[in-house]
Structures are given as C-alpha cells and as structure tokens.
C-alpha cells in the first residue's frame, strides 16, 4: 500500500525545512502559499499517474485556481516538475535520516538507510523516477552539502561513519558512489519488475556492502 507522503518544501530547499504532511487526494491551498500548494498537489498527482500523464492544468484544478495563476509561479510544466523533484529528493533524505537514527550503530544505520532508499522508490515510483530523471546542472553526488538534497548528504554522512578516518576524499566519494549505485540499481530492478519486492532479499543485498 502506498504510504502518505510527507514532503519537505520551501523556496530554499535546505535540510532545515519543515516536513509538511498533506492528504494525497485533497491538498489544501491557502492564500499566499500557491507555490507550495502546487507542489503538494503535484506530489499527490504523481501517486496516481506517471510523469508522462502529469498535467499542470490538473494540478490547478485540484487546488482550485486557474492554470494562468500557476503560470505566474511556474513558467511551464517542467518548472513545476523540477520543484516537485527537489521536494522528493529532500523527503527521500529525511526518510533515510529517520531510518539511520533508529538503527543506532553506524553499520546498521547504513543498511537501514539503504533499505529506506529502496522502500521509498517502491512506495512512490513515479516520484522516484522523476527525481533522478530531472536535469541538473551538475551530478547530484558532487553537489555542495545542502544543495543536492539531504538524500546525498545522508549518504555521505553514512559513508564517513564507517570508512577509515584517514581515507581520502576520493576514497570516500568512491565508497559513496558504490553504495548509491547498489541501492539505486536495486530500486530500479524492483520497479522494472526484474526482481521481486522481497524485503528480506533487499536487506541481504544491501548488507553485502557492509565491511566484515
């Protein structure tokens, strides 16, 4: 069953943003907050349909405004999808952070964070695909802390907690890339029907990345 999506959003998209929980079927629009309401409605719409079937006019209808009003904030559909993708990436990081903190020790936290990544993809497939299909000026993993979404910050933090203290930045980057490739590839295999949504199998695969 698809979980209700709590997402993190404001114009700056930093890790200090508040999590906003909005019912997926009826996001509410409050005067003066049209941009955030549009992102919420867009997230809800992606729970029901693919990115290809996403329509800006449907978002406007759901929040009770004209398409013209939305165009004042988003010049086209791609601009709105970009804002939704940014919110999704930060929310993914928040899910991973929560999983890591609940786990305790660094190695267990790494595994649980990876499981949370794959689980997010399975629970929100259209959003997950959008997040990583949206064009970016630079690779997400290379983005400065706080600008590429807290998902990448969380990944780098988890890697730093269990690699050797004297590891070079390049070594840590290679470890982070390897971990990301594993969980992202696993998520895509499940979404594309190439491997079953088997929680035990997913956990075993991710544990293989843990040293020792």
How would you name each of these model-derived features?
Residues 1-33, 44, 103:
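N-terminal intrinsically disordered/low-complexity leader segments
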Residues 26, 86-110, 142-150:
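Amphipathic alpha-helical linker/stalk segments
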Residues 34-42, 59, 84-88, 92, ...:
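Generic hydrophobic, amphipathic alpha-helix propensity
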Residues 37, 45-79, 83:
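Helix-turn-helix
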Residues 83, 97-127, 152, 176-179:
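Hydrophobic alpha-helical connector segments
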Residues 119-157, 165, 188, 192:
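Short secondary-structure transition hinges
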Residues 139-165, 170-177, 200-211:
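Amphipathic alpha-helical packing segments from all-alpha helical-bundle domains
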Residues 161, 180-197, 211-212:
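Amphipathic C-terminal alpha-helical segment
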């Amino acid at each position: 069953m698809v979980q209700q999506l709590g997402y993190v959003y404001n114009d700056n998209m930093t890790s200090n943003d508040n999590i906003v929980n909005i019912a997926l079927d009826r996001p509410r629009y409050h005067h003066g907050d049209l941009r955030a309401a549009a992102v919420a409605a867009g997230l809800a719409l992606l729970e029901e349909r693919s990115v290809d079937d996403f329509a800006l006019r449907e978002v406007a209808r759901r929040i009770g405004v004209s398409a013209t009003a939305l165009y004042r904030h988003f010049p086209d559909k791609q601009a709105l999808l970009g804002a939704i993708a940014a919110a999704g990436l930060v929310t993914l990081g928040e899910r991973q952070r929560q999983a890591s903190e609940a786990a305790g020790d660094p190695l267990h936290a790494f595994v649980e964070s990876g499981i949370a990544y794959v689980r997010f993809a399975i629970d929100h497939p259209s959003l997950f695909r959008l997040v990583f299909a949206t064009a970016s000026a630079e690779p997400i993993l290379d983005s400065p802390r706080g600008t590429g979404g807290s998902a990448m910050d969380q990944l780098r933090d988890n890697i730093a907690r269990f690699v050797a203290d004297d590891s070079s930045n390049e070594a840590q980057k290679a470890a982070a890339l390897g971990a990301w490739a594993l969980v992202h590839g696993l998520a895509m295999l499940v979404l594309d029907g190439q491997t079953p949504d088997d929680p035990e199998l997913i956990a075993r695969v991710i544990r293989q990345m843990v040293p020792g």
